[in-house]
Amino acid sequence: ALWRIVSQQCLPNQQAHDNPAPCTQVDVPAGFVVFKDRNGPLQYLLMPSAKITGIESPAVLDATTPNFFAQAWRARHVMAERYGKPIDDGDISLAINSEYGRTQNQLHIHISCLLPAVKQRLAQIGPDFIDQWQPLPGGLLGHDYLGRRVTPAELEQQGAFRLLASGLPRAERRMGSFGLAMTALPDGDFL
């Protein structure tokens, strides 16, 4: 359904009428669209303007593929525009489901707000994270996670997908097994 919306509505409307509807934003040169998710008042999806199934696609590791996580971070302003006032970066999360945890076969990154309990927990443990993948102490909401600190330069230059693939043993061959999430830390880095 998502790919049909992108390919049959958003892209044609942008190209023919300079109107991204039903998407919020279409950036053909940069290779992405932003679409209002039907769930939640401030939840959006950033999707490629090309057909890419998900995190398991080899395309996400190709250096010529747009850096979708960096683009999603830059697109976070759509939430504040809809809300009518600024939203603190520490309240925003980006997330992509694993191949097995999603219902759509078009790569999409969720742009939404963190649950307050998650924000509080990450604030407690965030300062302890380094630039290597490590387990989140005690997990989060009953699940085990790995985390690492990412600088803005790393996000822009390498992107979240390549950082995952190069940072964990055998991850490159098992990308579909992973979900990824990202939020800002108070010092400007990401977790």
Where are these regions (language model features)?
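HIT superfamily nucleotide-processing domains
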Residues: 1-191
